[in-house]
Amino acid sequence: MGSMKSIKIRNRWTGSVVFEYTKEGNTITETVLGAIRRGADLHGADLCGADLSGADLRGADLHGANLRNADLSGADLRSADLRSANLYGANLCDANLRDANLRDADLRGANLCGANLCGADLYGADLCDANLCDANLRDADLRGANLRG
């Protein structure tokens, strides 16, 4: 039998615990999915460097979350709220961001290669030096977005 492992998700601004999950062999992915299933408020959650590759995050409220350098490759983020999220250097390769709200998100240096951004709201997002190779941007709102680099 493995040992019980507790993982806490903290607010990036206040440091307060917004969700805690304990189970045998726990991972950050299981903790985030548990938080979403239980309707926890992940607004401003600090998930810096988290491995959420392949996770089902459809409709998740990650408004203002710190996902800097997180691995979201292949994740399902359809209709997720990522307004003002810090996704600097995040790996979103082959992620499904269809109809996601990425208004004012920091996507500098993010890898969006092959990502589905169809219908995504990228108004005011910073995509400087982001890799958009083979990304689907059909019907995406790029007004005011920074696409330099």
Residue ranges and their predicted role:
Residues 1-118, 123, 128, 133, ...:
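Extended, small-residue-rich solenoid/repeat segments and analogous flexible loops
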